[in-house]
Amino acid sequence: MSDSFLHDHLQSRELFSYFGLAVYYSQALEQQMANFIILIKVAAGDMSSEEQLKENFEKKLSNSLGQLVREISHYFTFPEDEMDLLRHIWKMRNFIVHDYFKQKIHATFTEEGRVSMINELKQFCEDAAKLQALLQRHTHQLYNQIDLKEE
């Protein structure tokens, strides 16, 4: 195997690894948003039974990121910079999951193209991790404000 072929192969593997990581971060954000919405509803007294909680949680887990973003916006006001990041992640997530390789397939055939794609996916992962941390902070703040007692 030539060095050039091996380099291209390894770089392609790296590209697909970052693509998978971007999808993972997207799913982790969906989970975190579902958690936050359910906690908001618990804090508001909208969940009166464990069965109702489980039912609502299952529904949230089947919602798309867009549905979760719209719903969470009804209950919680994010600072403008966080809302901008949330919208950016939502838009990029949809692009990555639905159109990324359709639109960028030709870039995968060159080293320059693959490097550009890897950098783009790395940036998405960094942005998603930042949003994840912000959502966790808001979730912990709300959790600490409410008094959850085991029954």
Where are these regions (language model features)?
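Short amphipathic alpha-helical segments at helix-loop
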Residues: H7-E14, H74, F78, G113-S116, ...
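Low-complexity, intrinsically disordered/propeptide-like segments
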Residues: S64, L68-E71, F124
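Amphipathic alpha-helical interface elements
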Residues: M1-G66, R87, L134-L148
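Weak global preference for isoleucine
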Residues: V23, I37-I40, I72, I89, ...
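Charge-enriched, short contiguous segments at helix-coil
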Residues: S4, D81-L134
